[in-house]
Amino acid sequence: MLLLRWKRFWFLSLGILLFSGVVSLMLFNLSESISFFYLPSDVARVVASNREIKVGGIIKAIKKSKDGVRFLLSDGAAEIEVLYEGILPSLVQDGINVVVVARFEGGLLLAKRVLVKHDERYYPPEDFIKSVRGE
């Protein structure tokens, strides 16, 4: 009888240990794949130089220059200037929500990618811009 209790105890303990190990591995892998983005008002206090981050906000004042495209990214509380060397997606214009993957250097975000934020519904480009602006 005592031997049966010890076997049951060790079997249950091993099961709990195995289950907690699997759950721990799942949570660890999930935490690596989740990607958050910062708001422009958070960038200055949380970002170290030369570290790649994601920053989300609303585009304001797009200007084309010889070194790329410059625009302001705003969250309503703060604005930060972004430099993107490349061709912007066709949906990018003033008032559109975007997420940029960039490095922060000297008060300027050097963008590697610009992603347009949208929901799961498909809109032709003209209708998308109208829906974002509330027309």
Swiss-Prot record:
Cross-referenced InterPro entries: CcmE, CcmE-like_sf, NA-bd_OB-fold
This protein's GO CC annotations: plasma membrane
Transmembrane segments: 9-29
Periplasmic side: 30-135
Binding site for heme: H118, Y122
MF annotations from Gene Ontology: heme binding; metal ion binding
GO BP terms in the entry: cytochrome complex assembly
Cellular localisation: Cell inner membrane
Membrane topology note: Single-pass type II membrane protein
Chief site of localization: membrane
SUPFAM superfamilies: Heme chaperone CcmE
Cystine crosslinks: none
Keywords linked to the UniProt accession: Cell inner membrane, Cell membrane, Cytochrome c-type biogenesis, Heme, Iron, Membrane, Metal-binding, Signal-anchor, Transmembrane, Transmembrane helix
All ranges on the Cytoplasmic side of the membrane: 1-8
Family statement drawn from the similarity comment of this UniProt entry: Belongs to the CcmE/CycJ family.
Function: Heme chaperone required for the biogenesis of c-type cytochromes. Transiently binds heme delivered by CcmC and transfers the heme to apo-cytochromes in a process facilitated by CcmF and CcmH.
UniProt protein name: Cytochrome c-type biogenesis protein CcmE
UniProt source species: Neorickettsia sennetsu (strain ATCC VR-367 / Miyayama)
